[in-house]
Amino acid sequence: MAMVETTGRDSKFIGNFTLTDIGEVDVITETGIIPSVKFKIKFDNGSISEDTTLPLEELGKLDWYSLHPHLKLCQKLPTAQQNLMNLIRSALPNSPKQTQYQVKRLGTHTIDGEPVYNTGGDLIRCSPITKNCTNILLVSQGYNLDIDQTLNESEAAAEMMKIVSLCPDVGRVIFSHLLLYIMRKAYKDAVIAPCCSLFLYGGSGQFKTTYSTFLTQIHNRSKGILRPDRLNSSIPGATELIYKKSDCVVVLDDLCPRDSKKTMAQQEETLLEIARIIADGTRPAKFRGHTVPRKEPPSCGVLFTGEYLIGTGSDAARLLPIRLTTPIDKVKLSECQAKPLVVSTFFHYYIKWYIEKYSTIQDLLRKWWEKYTKTDLGVHRRLQETHFFLNTANKIFLQYCMENGLTSPEKASVHHQSFENLLNCLVQAQDVRVKQGIKSNPNNVDFFDVLCALYKNGDFHVAKNRKRFNSSSSKYDGLIHNELLC
């Protein structure tokens, strides 16, 4: 069977195939509608290819040899391109027009009313009972959510919690930040888009970067954990990096003392500018000294790492610092690193649940947001929003655990209260820096003022004597001894 071009009484062979199922398609993308065509290739031996879909304007430039290794042309490529384009165009008026949604960006999409999640190599959709029959084309971007098939859902969750518990306070905050940005679109459509950044800081050699990158990378983990991008890149370079990412957390490393004051100043400037972009949804105009608004803010979160704090006033309000006080146990970290697919496997299960419960999650977010708007934590507005984002992401995770029998309501309640108390301490301590404009070096922080703020808000409890402090039921954080706070 051969493709034939008919011109008057003359017929010419074009190749060793014919085209079938030719049709016109409106391909709907995030930026608009692309008029396109689709067809299948049927070879002389009877085999038929998968659908080929491409923009109508690219039809005359198509490299036909790239479509299939067995395809042969009997004409020179430019001539064949023209003849095949004419043949396809002539068939379009007699074929029904179809609609196809093209999914390219990683993360959550709402298509024809149905939430779907692009993992890179697959689409996670609702169960067959609730999903619609929308035609969706997945455009591969070289990413994949690698899964350990030997881990069931409860095992994956248990192993994930081992990673988080390597550094309980830091781990829980980073984990909730990652959950938040995986569910970014649900937040954006229901209440408000996430716009908060974390800053993990502590001394050198504490495995800050190793831990944070291992915990936050969800794609291509079978190929190894990638080294994070560094803060010594230019502001335009770092800006382009975060605008290429979506529904994930980007780690930017490493703010530390340098011999060169110029280098330190440049890194600090980059960190603060990226924090502004995440919080405000603006990006800098290249080298013009001002910012220009984007139609959309970045769709990823950022986790900075460093050895000292920076930022005062409104800059401090855009960051939530978490201090790593002791090095992460190297042996336990190595044990977790030996199972790199735990994180991506856990999120495979979690995202399936998230997509299935998408509308329920949005309803919960609306209810919680209404309560938050009537609550005053006594901190800067941005810090209160950060508290909302991280606290509710953790609550949704606990809901997932309860629905799947991974924890009891009683344990979930204890976990929630503990995490909320942790967030209270973090945002209140940072609010002191916001209000007082404390210098960024941690050696200059007035921790007495921080403790006063925590005590005033009921998050720091002081015992009046050693007996109370040492009692088995003690819930005190410090004690007054010889007129000193210990």
Regions found by a protein language model. Give the residues of each.
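Phosphate-sensing "switch" segment of ASCE/P-loop ATPases
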Residues: 296-301, 313-408
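AAA+/SF3 P-loop NTPase mechanochemical coupling elements
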Residues: 243-245, 286-305
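DNA transaction DNA-binding modules
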Residues: 111, 115-151, 162-163, 258, ...
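AAA+/P-loop NTPase substrate/partner-engagement loops
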Residues: 201, 210-264
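Conserved glycine-centered beta->alpha loop in an early N-terminal alpha/beta scaffold
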Residues: 1-169, 215, 240-241, 245-247, ...
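P-loop NTPase catalytic core of nucleic-acid-dependent motor ATPases
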Residues: 131-225, 387
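Ser/Thr/Asn(+Pro)-rich, low-complexity disordered segments
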Residues: 47-54, 61, 119, 126-128, ...
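Conserved catalytic/switch belt of AAA+ P-loop NTPases
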Residues: 267-287
